[in-house]
Design a protein with these regions (language model features):
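Cytosolic-side transmembrane-helix boundaries in multi-pass membrane proteins
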Residues: 245-289
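Short loop segments and helix-boundary regions at transmembrane helix junctions
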Residues: 33-115, 211-223, 242-243
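Small-residue-rich segments of transmembrane alpha-helices in multi-pass membrane proteins
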Residues: 50-60, 97-109, 129-130, 173-177, ...
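Transmembrane helix-bundle core of multi-pass membrane transporters
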Residues: 2-16, 87, 91-154
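Membrane-helix/interface signature in polytopic inner-membrane proteins
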Residues: 147-180
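Transmembrane alpha-helical segments in multi-pass inner-membrane proteins
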Residues: 198-249
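Loop-to-transmembrane alpha-helix initiation sites
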Residues: 17, 66-73, 92, 96, ...
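Structural signature of hydrophobic alpha-helical transmembrane segments
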Residues: 13-25, 63-75, 139-143, 189-203
Length: 289
């Protein structure tokens, strides 16, 4: 029994997949707390699709895909930030323009210059086929991003809560937003290998949304988000060995199940709890009359 449970760790590719998935899951979950706070969930989706031309360009130039994806994602994030602040357009309009433009360019490049990597690999991900060099890149990206987040989480929290107050205490909202979007681009680059461009939005939204139903204070929300992201990614990668299914799909399904369970049963803000409170309030009103 124990030998069966430990069998995945006897294979190098599974150990690498589990390790990378856990770190990337924690990083994406950390950022998801801020996306929930600001209501920027769709920006994560836009950036996930905006890295496609960068990946295509990197392969054409013989560069690591992470470099191209990071440059493309950073450019898309900068354009979204610039247009949101200077054009007067609503954020969702800007996201739609940037998302479709970058993804369209990526598909166009791939169609013109067939590559050894298929567009399906970019979109769906394949963590089990990760090479040692790719794993090292992702671990470096994830570790550096987590260190920066640990150092700057409080400043980012102030900016995301109230930019005016952030300026009065000497912080630069624009500079910190650039830092945040850079970290978001880095996390999406890392997550691409894990779940692909289509499912990465779940990793940067679902953990924060789940923790939102449980926590009242933002620091606790961050910690719980990271815990949810790391545990579900670890479990999903581990279970994929026995289920023989797509690792990314299993991870996202697990995160969705956890979200639905918390949404229904959270003691303070869950759906069932809210309905019971409404029913109790109605009874008090009836008894009062």
């Amino acid at each position: 029994m124990i030998d069966t449970l430990l069998e995945p760790f006897s294979y190098g590719y599974m150990t690498s997949a589990i390790l990378v998935s856990t770190i990337v899951g924690g990083l994406c979950a950390f950022l998801s707390a801020y996306l929930m706070l600001k209501g920027w969930s769709l920006i994560g989706d836009a950036l996930a699709h905006s890295v496609v031309p960068g990946v295509a360009g990197a392969y054409l130039l013989g560069l690591p895909f992470a470099i191209g994806a990071f440059i493309s994602g950073g450019l898309a994030a900068s354009l979204m930030l610039f247009l949101s602040e200077r054009s007067g357009l609503k954020t969702d309009v800007v996201i739609g323009i940037i998302f479709t433009a970058f993804f369209g360019v990526g598909l166009f490049v791939v169609s013109l210059y067939p590559m050894s990597i298929s567009i399906e690999t970019i979109i769906m991900g394949n963590i089990l086929a990760i090479s040692y060099s790719d794993m090292l890149q992702l671990l470096i990206i994830g570790s550096i991003s987590l260190v920066i987040l640990f150092l700057k989480w409080r400043d980012l929290m102030v900016v995301f809560f109230d930019e005016s107050h952030a300026r009065t205490v000497g912080l630069s909202p624009s500079r910190l937003k650039i830092v945040f979007f850079t970290l978001l681009s880095a996390s999406i680059v890392a997550a691409l290998q894990t779940v692909g461009a289509f499912l990465v939005i779940a990793m940067v939204v679902t953990p924060g949304a789940t923790a939102y139903f449980i926590c009242d204070r933002f620091p606790k929300l961050i910690l719980l988000s990271v815990l949810i992201g790391s545990v579900t990614c670890f479990t999903g990668a581990y279970l994929s060995f026995f289920i023989d299914g797509a690792t990314g799909g299993i991870i996202v399904v697990l995160q969705t199940i956890v979200f639905l369970g918390v949404f229904l049963a959270a003691p303070k803000y869950g759906y069932i709890s809210a309905r019971l409170k409404i029913r109790q309030a109605n009874k008090r009103i009836e008894n009062g009359f």
